[in-house]
Amino acid sequence: MLYNQENVRDNVRNREGKRVFYLAKGDQLTSGARDFLSRERIEILPAELARAESYRLLNGASLEEKPEHMTHLDAQILDPKNHPRILFRGKMDTLEAELILCQLAAERLAAPVGEILALARRLIRCDVLNEPVPEGKLCGLTGDEQRRRSHFPQDYYGQPHFMPGVGDVDVIARLNRARCAAREAELAGVTAFCDREGNPTRPDILRSLNRMSSMLYLLMIQEKSKK
C-alpha cells in the first residue's frame, strides 16, 4: 500500500505515550507522508511490533479496532471525522495545498508564502499537542504593523483596496484562492475553538488564522501595485 499524508494521519498510533506509525513490509510512503512524520516527530516502526491496543473515545469507551469513520483527535483519543477540530484540520490541509501552488506560481513568492505555510503547519501541531502558538512576526511584520497595512494599503504600497478580476495576473488569482482557503480555515476554526457561549478556547490559533488571510491579502496588494 502507498500511504499519503491523510492515510498516515489517520493511522498514527500511540505506543507507550509516544506517537508512532507502523509500516508493513512492502508498504511505501509518499514524500508528503514522510515529511509529515518527520515534521511531527512520529517514529516509523515495523508493523511486526504492533500489538493489539484499545482506542479511547471521548465518552470514555474503548475499541479494539479503529472504525473507518473515526480518526485521531490527538495521540490518545478517537473521534468521528466530522468533529469540528477534524474538519478544521481538513481545511488546513486544503490551505497548505493552495499555498504550495502559490509558491510554484512565482519564485518571488516562495519565501513570504513559505512563512505562511510554516505557520499553518505550526497551528496543526499546536492543536494536536495542545501547545501555545508562539508570538512573532509574519513576513517581517508584527500583528499591529500588519493590521495598519491591511486597513490602509494606499499609504504603504500606493495601491488601494481592490476586488480581483479576470484582468489580473495569474499570481493574484492564486493568492486570492489561498486567501479564500485561509478564510474558510478561519471560519472552521471559530466553530472548533469556541465554547457554547461563543468564547474562544484557543484565541492564539484564531488570531494566527486571521493573520494568515490578512497577509495573503497584503501579498495581493503588493502584486497589484507592480502593474
Regions found by a protein language model. Name each.
Residues 31, 39-227:
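Phosphate/pyrophosphate-binding loop motifs in nucleotide- or prenyl diphosphate-using proteins
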